[in-house]
From Swiss-Prot:
Biological role stated in the UniProt entry: One of the primary rRNA binding proteins, it binds specifically to the 5'-end of 16S ribosomal RNA.
GO BP: any one term: translation
Gene assigned in the entry: rpsQ
Domain of life: Bacteria
GO CC annotations, alphabetized: cytosolic small ribosomal subunit
Annotated protein name in UniProt: Small ribosomal subunit protein uS17
Organism annotation: Thermotoga maritima (strain ATCC 43589 / DSM 3109 / JCM 10099 / NBRC 100826 / MSB8)
NCBIfam families per record: PRK05610.1 (NF004123), uS17_bact (TIGR03635)
Pfam families found in the cross-reference section: Ribosomal_S17 (PF00366)
Alphabetized UniProt keyword annotations: Ribonucleoprotein, Ribosomal protein, RNA-binding, rRNA-binding
PANTHER family: 40S RIBOSOMAL PROTEIN S11 FAMILY MEMBER, SMALL RIBOSOMAL SUBUNIT PROTEIN US17M
Disulfide bonds: none
Subunit and interaction comment: Part of the 30S ribosomal subunit.
Amino acid sequence: MPRKRLTGIVVSDKMDKTVVVAVEKLVQHPLYKKYVKRTKKYHAHDERNECKIGDVVEIEETRPLSKTKRWRVVRIIQRFEPERVVKEKEDIQEEIEAVEGKGGVES
């Protein structure tokens, strides 16, 4: 039987050779049938300590490595780039100022 694989974001890298990965999934509410986001955190083994906070990683189920570790990092899908986040915030701010300048927001 193939091992389960999940994709998530690294939320902590403070431990040696271990990262905490937050995995989001959509779950349908049993009564209201609305889809709700659920987040679960997994401790994953990072052999070379290459993962940093904000990285998008793929983790795979493995044998128990410790009391809480049952997953290992397979690969880093995307590195976290703080410059990109700052640039996106600046672009959004410029769009807001442009809309307000045209009279889009009335008080």
